[in-house]
Amino acid sequence: MKLDELRKKYIDFFKSKGHCEIAGKSLIPDNDSTVLFNTAGMQPLVPYLLGEMHPSGDMLVDVQKCLRTGDIDEVGDLSHLTFFEMLGNWSLGAYFKELSVKYSFEFLTSPNYLNISKDKLYVSVFEGDESIPRDTETANVWESLGIPKDRIFYLSREHNFWGPVGNTGPCGPDTEIFVDTGKEKCSVRCDITCSCGKYFEIWNNVFMQYKRDENGNYEELKRKCVDTGMGIERTITFLQGKSSVYDTDAFKPIIDKIEKISGKIYGQNLEDDRSIRIIADHIKASCFILADNFAVLPSNIGQGYVLRRIIRRAIRYAKKLGMESYVLADLVDSVEEIYKSFYKELTEKKDFIKAELNVEEEKFFKTLRHGEQEFIKLIQQLSSKSIPGDISFKLYDTYGFPYEITEELATEYGFSIDKAGFEEHFKKHQEVSKKGGDKVFKGGLADCTYETTKLHTATHLLHKALQLVLGEHVRQKGSNITAERLRFDFNHPYKMTDDEIKQVEDMVNLQIKNKLSVKRSVMNLDDALAKGAMALFGEKYEDIVSVYEIDGFSIEVCGGPHVKNTGELGTFKIQKEQASSSGVRRIRAILID
């Protein structure tokens, strides 16, 4: 069974059971500031698991993009992935343990779906502890479906209790479903808790019964929910009879392309194989981050730093294989080939993704050349095999050399690093930067005079015009408006041409000439985003937001103020377009009466 087929069968099955298919959310969480990316299928639905009503109903099915970077140094083995997809079906109070288990059993065993013999199924349930009782209810449902007691395992909290994602939130017992692969037992003690590979965990059904508070106490949820998760990549590895996900159609087109470019053959050399897997994983993750609606770009902070790190790690391993410059962009088509039927954004933003990868690769090759040369000079001066924190920080601060790459180079040359020393220098650097940063441009309106208000409305027109001329990737990165001029920062990898500047100017002035009405409405944030309203990346909004729509042209989440009609603005003129920072451009513009 192929990747696309599994995804479709899952959605079709649960839709046939009355579930509503909902679109997966962005990789960037909008309701959890504790993590940089959505790392689990349930994360975007936490508010609804806690009691909010979902606009699509109480029985849902989705496919959620996820990204985990905690194990990034492990990526390159046969199993760890940065980007992955989670299939999920959800009950927000509509049904609970019995129906959830029965749905899972039917999908797994029905000849119309996965067609796995029930004689190969093993399950685990929560054994209970001093806080939460033993889950005999779920065990009884499994037994009623023909799973004998000797294939039902009661396991501890470590194995069969899920969540919360942070320290607090929804959580509960789960039941994990395993398939006997037919391999020989590794020992007489071999069972589903063994990591030898005989038993494959195919699905997990979480029963959100409780909410954990900040004191570690558990309170029963008024509305009990079901959250199930099936990892697509893991499942197709089993269904296709492969030993590794990298042997499946989730990666084969990418690996085929790497083989063609590098001249290396996957499966012939352990070191080369690891490099190929790292490149394949990281290019896929990079494509999905760059294609995301929030338009994350490589940088030295937050999500941008993660993106920069995985791009640069892929470049290093491509270099090890002897691959030439700008090779990552050549792999984008292979990622698109795998996912284009389901993720249209990979096709729509393909040119932008390639351009950003080339820009980052060009920057990094310069960094690598200078950084590696300096690294070798510095370690030659050391009297021990330990690299002090001030040296690793100097490589980071002066040469833009990521700590992780210094760490990898140190390992290659037989050195260790004083990580605590690096972190101490890094923290001091942050404190100094923060004090200085209090004085720099943060964006926003200097006042609410009529002239400033007009320029604020012009900024909305400019934002949309830039997207239409340069591409949908354009997002506001900063804004500063006075009564005399507007200053607008936006992400874009290249200097604008004179023709592009003129196109933007003309487009804004056309909207002014058309005398479009500017209307304000108040609505739920999710409704605003569904309506197509632009929102600022990283901005934390209330549940109810103000939305300004410029008739048929622009719609943004914004607090205002704005004029009533674009005809009030006068003539829009761009005075200057220049670089603001890496990957960010700045426009200065005025209005002429």
Curated annotation (Swiss-Prot):
Its EC number is 6.1.1.7. SUPFAM superfamilies: Class II aaRS and biotin synthetases, Putative anticodon-binding domain of alanyl-tRNA synthetase (AlaRS), ThrRS/AlaRS common domain. Its cofactor is Zn(2+). GO terms for molecular function: alanine-tRNA ligase activity; aminoacyl-tRNA deacylase activity; ATP binding; tRNA binding; zinc ion binding. Zn(2+) binds at residues 456, 460, 558, 562. Binds 1 zinc ion per subunit. It is an enzyme of class 6 (ligase). Consists of two domains; the N-terminal catalytic domain (in this organism this is shorter than usual) and the editing domain; the C-terminal C-Ala domain found in most orthologs is missing. The editing domain removes incorrectly charged amino acids. It is found in: Cytoplasm. The gene is alaS. It comes from Borrelia hermsii (strain HS1 / DAH). This is Alanine--tRNA ligase.
